[in-house]
Each structure stands twice: as C-alpha cells, then as structure tokens.
C-alpha cells in the first residue's frame, strides 16, 4: 500500500557530516595555544600587570601601574581580567596568569558560536559550520585567539553585531535593538570611538538597499541608539566627575578623528604595507571571499545579505588602515 508523505514529512537521508568533529577541532585549537604558554608580547605583560594592579590598589575606574594611568581605552577588558583572576584564582586555586588566559578562551568560544549562528542565519542551514571552519583557518585569528588582549572582546562585539543583523527580522524590535546597542557599546569600550563610528555608518548605509530599508530595521536602529548612548555615558560620566583631565587626554589620544585628515598622505604612502599584512592575516578567507564575489557578482546588490557582505569588506579594510 502506497502512503503519501508531505515533502516536509518525508524522511531525510542521514547526513554524513559530523558536527562534533568541528567542536573537537575548535577545542583543540583553543586549548593548545593557551595551556602552558608564557606571555610572548610586551602588550600581554603590560595588560597582565594592570590587571594585577587593579586587584592590588582597587583603582577600578582608572587603573594605574606605578602611577601611570591606563588610557589606551576604557578599562572594560581589565575589569573582566581582574574578575576572572579573582574568581578562578581566589576561589578555584587556578594560577593568576592562566585564569586571565582562560578568559580569552571563553570569549573566543562564544565568538565561534555566534559567528556560526550568524553564518547560518545569513546563508542557511549547515553554513554556520563552514563559517567557523574558515575563521579557524585564518592566520590572523591564531594570533588573536591565544593572547592576553582586548581584541577577542572586540571580535565579540562584531560577532554579536553580525548575529543580530542575521536574525533581526525574526526578533522583537526591543530585543534586537537592545542587543545591537550592546554590541556597539562593547565595541566602544574596547576600541573607542572609531570602530563605533564605522559600525553606525555601516548600519545606516544598509538603508540604501530596498530590502534593508523597512520599518522593522529602522525601529531596531532607533532602539539601538536609545540603549547605546546611556551605556557609553556610564564610564564617560564617571570619568568626567572623578578624572576630567585624564578623560580629556583619553579623548584627544583615542578619538581618532583629530589625526585622521592629517594622516591621509601617510596612509596613502603605506597602502601597500597594509594590503600586504591584511592579505597575510586574512588568508585564506579573503581568497574565498574574492571567489564568492566573482561567482555571485550579479547578486551583490540585489540580495541584501551579499550587499551587507560587500559593505563589511570595504569598511573593514578602511578601519584596519
């Protein structure tokens, strides 16, 4: 007797893919670069010293090391490093240095998860695994993912941003806007104003595409601004009250806009240097991106996701320079 099954109810053939192999690869990739490793770069030693100084002198708002304040960015990363050291070392007995390195491991794990979900949201089922595999294979991520550095948190903000854009149309406006605002605020606390400026411009540029220019997305952006501005005002306001001179010094040295126009001739003269390094650190992702652009060039503007990808590439290159 023949039995009719609707298409969605028909039994699907078992996939030969094994997702647990990707999880195992990610765990091996993360752990082998952290366990038993000394601090390689001077930036790692400096950040680790500031983290220890926070726990010693309890200057949380403006960490200082031998009376030298930390003004590279907000102390957001140092706060998390100090909290991880206090919890893992003080309560679990893990060595202080390894406790801070574990923070990098946990943040990179969240990055892989969010980027995989973003890849699935943009490109469809099973494409998230491909996204994570490509990211793990990039040479630059090997350096980024195994050091005591605020850069994994910057990648976390970009991962959250990408994930929200891939799912915003399925989320309530308030939830999507809040998460997008948190991503912007996290980027600000790690890398100051320039990265937020580029993310906001990118978000607004998407409105030039008819599929992005809709009521839901516009309301998400408005809600994101409504949450983003108060979030960044917390640290700025506290610094203005307690350390106004250091706040001014931080703004002058890290805003980026003051030195942008005078440095344009210098950037043009060293364009080859930046292109060379970017091509090395982004290998092999940039080759795959170039092949994809050639294959789907007719969809670059018609499809909203491909339009976003092209904007990402252009703005990412400009920001790195």
Locations of regions flagged by a protein language model:
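Start-transfer (signal-anchor) and selected internal transmembrane alpha helices
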Residues: 1-31, 219-227
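Extracytosolic helix-loop segments that constitute the early lumenal/periplasmic catalytic or substrate-binding loops
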Residues: 28-29, 47-72, 76, 83-86
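Transmembrane-lumen/periplasm boundary regions of multi-pass, lipid-linked membrane glycan transferases
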Residues: 50-53, 189-190, 195-321
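Transmembrane-helix motifs of polytopic, lipid-linked glycan transferases
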Residues: 98-122, 160
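Membrane-interface transmembrane helices that cradle and orient dolichyl/undecaprenyl
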Residues: 120-126, 161-179, 183-187
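Short helix- or helix-capping micro-motifs
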Residues: 131-136, 184
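Short acidic/glycine- and proline-prone juxtamembrane loop motifs at membrane-interface regions
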Residues: 140-154, 191-193
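Membrane-interface alpha helices of multi-pass inner-membrane proteins
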Residues: 142-143, 175-192, 316-321
């Amino acid at each position: 007797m023949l039995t009719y099954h609707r298409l969605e109810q028909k039994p699907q053939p078992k996939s030969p893919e094994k997702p647990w192999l990707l999880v195992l690869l990610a765990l091996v990739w993360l752990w082998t670069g952290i366990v038993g490793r000394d601090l390689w770069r001077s930036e790692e030693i400096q950040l680790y010293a500031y983290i220890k100084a926070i726990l010693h002198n309890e200057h949380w708002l403006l960490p200082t090391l031998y009376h030298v304040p930390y003004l590279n960015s907000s102390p957001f990363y140092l706060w998390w490093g100090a909290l991880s050291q206090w919890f893992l070392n003080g309560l679990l007995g893990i060595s202080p240095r390894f406790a801070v390195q574990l923070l990098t491991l946990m943040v990179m794990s969240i990055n892989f998860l969010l980027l995989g979900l973003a890849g699935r949201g943009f490109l469809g089922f099973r494409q998230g695994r491909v996204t994570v595999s490509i990211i793990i294979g990039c040479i630059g991520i090997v350096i980024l993912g195994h050091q005591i550095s605020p850069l994994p948190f910057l990648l976390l903000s970009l991962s959250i941003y990408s994930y929200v854009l891939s799912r915003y149309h399925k989320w309530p406006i308030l939830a999507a806007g809040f998460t997008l605002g948190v991503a912007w605020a996290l980027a600000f606390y790690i890398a100051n104003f320039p990265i937020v400026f580029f993310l906001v411009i990118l978000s607004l540029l998407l409105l030039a595409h008819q599929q992005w220019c809709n009521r839901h997305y516009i309301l998400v952006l408005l809600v994101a601004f409504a949450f983003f501005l108060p979030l960044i005002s917390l640290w700025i306001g506290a610094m203005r009250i307690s350390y106004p001179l250091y706040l001014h010094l931080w703004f002058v040295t890290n805003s980026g806009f003051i030195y942008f126009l005078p440095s344009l001739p210098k950037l043009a003269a060293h364009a080859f240097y930046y292109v060379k390094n970017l091509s090395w650190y982004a290998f092999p992702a940039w080759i795959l991106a170039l092949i994809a652009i050639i294959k789907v060039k007719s969809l670059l503007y018609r499809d909203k996701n491909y339009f976003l990808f092209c904007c990402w590439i252009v703005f990412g290159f400009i920001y790195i320079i």
